[in-house]
């Protein structure tokens, strides 16, 4: 199965951010905007896209999606662009058992711990900027930042996956699916009876 590593860069400001809101509230807010996405297929070249119609043209038929904090990137991938991979992978979830109480599970901390490279800081300069607000030079720097994040995530996955139990990967996938692609099963008979009760009470 092919591994598609992704990282979305999105608009945020001092009030509208993941530090102030839940992931779901942030993604469903009317202020949400994708600036761009970096995509790497297996160990191929990582590419940056600002046009989402072009971004997903070359996805393999049989693939899994890898990200660092897949709850966020995976939800954008599924909710906004209706893409459905066969499997979800998440380096943050993979790192938690070993690093949550020590190194921490940020991509920056883990990259430093495993000597994979350095995570950039360009995201700190993008606060309050819509895509239209970026100069070409700023957007180029942001693209390089995003591409680097994808490269670090893929390298981290290669480190963490050595000896990582398949059963645990399946638990991670199932846990992510409960958020990214939730399924609600309704009791039709109970709802019909409840509706009848409401109608009856209104008539009295």
Residue spans for each PLM region:
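Conserved DEDDh/DEDDy metal-dependent 3′-5′ exonuclease domain
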Residues: 2-4, 13-20, 28-159
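Active-site neighborhoods of enzyme catalytic cores
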Residues: 23
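Mixed-charge, glycine-rich, non-catalytic linkers/tails in nucleic-acid processing enzymes
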Residues: 85, 125-204
């Amino acid at each position: 199965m092919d591994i598609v590593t992704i990282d979305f860069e999105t608009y945020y400001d001092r009030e509208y951010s993941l530090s102030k809101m839940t992931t779901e509230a942030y993604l469903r807010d009317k202020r949400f905007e994708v600036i761009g996405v970096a995509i790497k297929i297996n160990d191929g070249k990582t590419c940056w896209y600002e046009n989402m119609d072009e971004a997903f043209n070359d996805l393999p038929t049989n693939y899994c999606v890898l990200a660092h904090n897949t709850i966020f990137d995976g939800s954008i991938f599924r909710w906004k662009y209706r893409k459905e991979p066969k499997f979800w992978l998440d380096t943050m979830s993979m790192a938690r058992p070993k690093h949550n109480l020590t190194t921490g599970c940020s991509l920056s901390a883990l990259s430093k711990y495993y000597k994979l490279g350095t995570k950039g800081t360009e995201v700190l300069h993008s606060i309050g900027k819509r895509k239209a607000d970026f100069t070409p030079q700023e957007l180029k720097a942001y693209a390089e930042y995003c591409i680097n994040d994808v490269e670090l995530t893929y390298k981290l996955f290669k480190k963490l996956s050595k000896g990582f139990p398949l059963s645990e990967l399946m638990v991670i996938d199932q846990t992510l699916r409960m958020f990214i692609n939730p399924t609600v099963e309704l009791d039709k008979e109970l709802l019909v009876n409840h509706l009848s009760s409401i109608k009856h009470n209104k008539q009295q």
